[in-house]
Amino acid sequence: TPKPSSAASDVYKRQERIERDGTSPMLLYGYGAYGITVSPTFSTMRLSLLDRGFVYAIAHIRGGSMLGYQWYLDGKLEQRENTFNDFVDVANFLVDQKYTAAGNISIVGRSAGGELMGAAVIQAPHLWRSVNLGVPFVDVLNSMLDESLPLTPPEWKEWGNPIEDKWAFDLLRRYSPYENITTREYPPMLVSGGLNDPRVTYWEPAKWTAKMRSTKTDNNLLVMRINMGAGHFANTGRFGRFKDYAEEYVFTLLAHNIKQ
């Protein structure tokens, strides 16, 4: 398997504004599930970050298929933890290459990427300046145990069936982010969900936030945002998603003490 740090990351920056001296803030995006490839595309919204000195990076980790079908297979079922390890490896590589520094990286992911964010903040909290968990699939074990949820049975092929298979139960309990929250300090977190989300039900981000609030030992900001009119894909309408991005970017910028 190619090392993710050498084969699977895209980095965006404004060359005339950023030196590779480790001082730049970074926003690192990850997904890593279902064989979905996150193509490097142009986004006008990212310019707001780049103009403020950020480096924006995409981690093409296992669970996706950027490097082929096997890359996907190596990030599902019993190989799922490869996805989390790859993401942390990519971050460490970008630090080693002096695009940024440990503790100066904000991270963002949605849905299965939100699960990744939960795992990453537990595995390597010292790396992150802030964490944005969008509609996060953080309570993997309990969701896969509830076959009344409409999407649970079709998802067993991706995560395993803990109802019928003790091996799958033990696997999900070992890595499910919700099950692994411990008493310690965590970076600032923005946790969002949609009340009408049929894929990641609103109580997953709510349970995550409640357990974090009762467990963590720091005073860092922990914000939960539930959109009462949204489903899995957040705000709709012409400007709804722009509003969401604006709020998420403000949270990220303030975590880096950038106020303009």
List each model region and its residues.
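Single conserved hydrophobic/aromatic residue that forms the stacking wall/gate
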Residues: 1-8, 12
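Short hydrophobic segments within beta-strands
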Residues: 13, 29-30, 108, 192
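Short beta-strand-to-loop junctions in surface cap/lid or active-site-entrance loops
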Residues: 10-22, 178-182
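Conserved HGGG/HGGXW glycine-rich cap/lid loop of the alpha/beta-hydrolase fold
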Residues: 36-38
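Short beta-strand element of the alpha/beta-hydrolase
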Residues: 21-32
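Active-site-proximal cap/loop segments of hydrolase catalytic domains
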Residues: 58-260
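Short amphipathic alpha-helix adjacent to the substrate-entry channel of hydrolases
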Residues: 40-59
